[in-house]
Amino acid sequence: MCANASKRIIAYIIDFIFISAILMIVSYFIPKNSNVEFLNKDINDLTEQALNGEITFSSYASEYSNYLSSIDSENVVYNVVSVIIIIIYYVIIPIIFKATLGKYIMKLEITREDTKKLNIFNTFIRSIVVDGLLYSIITIFLVQLVSSKIYLISLIILGFIQFILVITSLFMILYRHDKKGLQDILSKSIVIDKEVKE
């Protein structure tokens, strides 16, 4: 039987906390770039100037986009490693175990609608919708290919799209009779509650 919304939301939160902790731990093992520290300090100084009214909003946005683009360029190794970890956790592990850690703890399982074995297409589509995988991949390339202003605008637009996808999926899980989210429909998969017998 399809899992109820509260169990799915709790599983999502567990997964988010777990993957955030993993990424934080990994960040300690990736060599630090001293430029990033200086750029972060510059962003803080710039923000303080903007808050004090010392610079205009357009100047702030222009400078901020330069700093942000530079920081993300400097952090490319960490960003690539993060995407690899996200792919392993949200795409590969569910194929093998039919669940992420959060779903396993909540006794949920991801299956295909047609009851065949999950494949990479199913889990990749799920991850694009609710885990921000495509957002992460696109931003790695964008920071290398476009100007800092276009990069900032792209981040805002992509972030907004990702937010809308997650909220849409949440409302679908909460209010649809079959409890399917957008990721379930697009990937032709369902999340079932292993504790509930049909």
Where are these regions (language model features)?
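Short, small/hydrophobic-residue-rich motifs at membrane-helix boundaries and re-entrant hairpins
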Residues: 1-145, 149, 156-172, 176-198
